[in-house]
């Protein structure tokens, strides 16, 4: 299609004017934007990284992680912080719930000496701290725990029983408008942990909703629904949880995928167990009876012993991890979908639509 040369000249002139006024990169053709290849940070779980499609959580975006109590929300964010710190990134934890356990964080691999931590008095203060850290351009990952604990100043200064209808939602809406652009410019990942509430009087569809209004749902590039699906036992003692994470919303890859992994108490995500399972599924690790072998060498009898071997030999674990990432991220459909999820589990949190 032939373009009018006068229009081309006018467009070139206005582009030069815009870049002169607002800076280089303020406007460009979509195909020229090299930043479309999204930089990511691992979640600590290989299967979740694959389910996300891009290999982890995207930098410069807002992410929401929600689920019931004790489902692993904070553990997952601490795993993200540990992964980011291993890459030399600076992280901050806004502890609005005043419940962060530094001993547990250290066990998960978090460098607590270099983790910035704030325990704000009000929701406005927490969000202003987020904005200041973002605009500095010096912080790579910020975690807010949690949206439900971001209490507006008016509510704190008022009396118990006073009505503050929609105050938290307005606060979050204003904060999202302010933060979204700054996050993109500074390439900062902002993770909000959220809790679940029940809608009153819902007869059909899913009665669950998240706190803080609708703004976060719209501005989040990724929303993760994390659930505990079972217990892991060592004899009669419960030592961890079977966990399922569903990608409810994803703006950087295809949504609605899910991942299953184990969270062990005091240890975090069971990476080596995940490597053994995925390695066997994709024929990187051979299994004969109860014995597991890698490249012809036996690595253990039983899944637990094979996982222990990989823990003691991190070079081999890294090699398997790298091979699996190359295989699965180039072909995400290779990660077999779990067919045992119930219809109720596959209901969109907001619309009630089955997917």
From Swiss-Prot:
One of its GO terms (cellular component) is cytosol. One of its GO terms (molecular function) is ATP hydrolysis activity. NCBIfam families: tigrfam_recA. Belongs to the RecA family. Can catalyze the hydrolysis of ATP in the presence of single-stranded DNA, the ATP-dependent uptake of single-stranded DNA by duplex DNA, and the ATP-dependent hybridization of homologous single-stranded DNAs. It interacts with LexA causing its activation and leading to its autocatalytic cleavage. ATP binds at residues 67-74. It is found in: Cytoplasm. InterPro entries: AAA+_ATPase, DNA_recomb/repair_RecA, DNA_recomb/repair_RecA_CS, P-loop_NTPase, RecA-like_C, RecA-like_N, RecA_ATP-bd, RecA_C_sf. This is Protein RecA. It comes from the Bacteria. GO terms for biological process: DNA recombination; DNA repair; SOS response. Keywords: ATP-binding, Cytoplasm, DNA damage, DNA recombination, DNA repair, DNA-binding, Nucleotide-binding, SOS response.
């Amino acid at each position: 299609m032939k373009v009018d040369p006068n229009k081309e000249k006018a467009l070139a002139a206005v582009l030069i004017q815009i870049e002169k006024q607002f800076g280089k990169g303020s406007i460009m053709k979509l195909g020229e934007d090299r930043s479309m290849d999204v930089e990511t940070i691992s979640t600590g779980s290989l299967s979740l990284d694959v389910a996300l499609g891009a290999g982890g959580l995207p930098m410069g975006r807002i992410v929401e992680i929600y689920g019931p109590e004790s489902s692993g929300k904070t553990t997952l964010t601490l795993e993200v912080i540990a992964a980011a710190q291993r890459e030399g990134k600076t992280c901050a934890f806004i502890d609005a719930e005043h419940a962060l356990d530094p001993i547990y964080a250290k066990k998960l691999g978090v460098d607590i000496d270099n983790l910035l931590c704030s325990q704000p008095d009000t929701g406005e203060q927490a969000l202003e701290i987020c904005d200041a850290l973002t605009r500095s351009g010096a912080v790579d990952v910020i975690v807010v725990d949690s949206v439900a604990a971001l209490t507006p100043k008016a509510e704190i200064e008022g009396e118990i029983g006073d009505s503050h209808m929609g105050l938290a939602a307005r606060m979050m809406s204003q904060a999202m408008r302010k933060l979204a652009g700054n996050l993109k410019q500074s390439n900062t990942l902002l993770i909000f942990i959220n809790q679940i509430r029940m809608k009153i009087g819902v007869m059909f569809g899913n009665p669950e909703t998240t706190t803080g209004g609708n703004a976060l749902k719209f501005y989040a590039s990724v929303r993760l629904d994390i659930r505990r699906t079972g217990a892991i036992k060592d004899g009669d003692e419960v030592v961890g949880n079977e966990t399922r994470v569903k990608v409810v919303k994803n703006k950087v890859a295809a949504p609605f995928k899910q991942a299953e992994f184990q969270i062990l108490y005091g240890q975090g995500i069971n990476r080596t167990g995940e490597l053994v399972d995925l390695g066997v599924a994709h024929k990187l690790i051979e299994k004969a009876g109860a014995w597991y072998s890698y490249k012809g060498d036996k690595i253990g009898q039983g899944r637990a012993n094979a996982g222990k071997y990989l823990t003691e030999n991190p070079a081999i674990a890294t090699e398997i991890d790298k091979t699996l990432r190359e295989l699965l991220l180039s072909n995400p459909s290779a990660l077999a979908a779990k067919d045992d999820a119930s219809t109720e589990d596959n209901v969109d949190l907001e619309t009630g639509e089955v997917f």
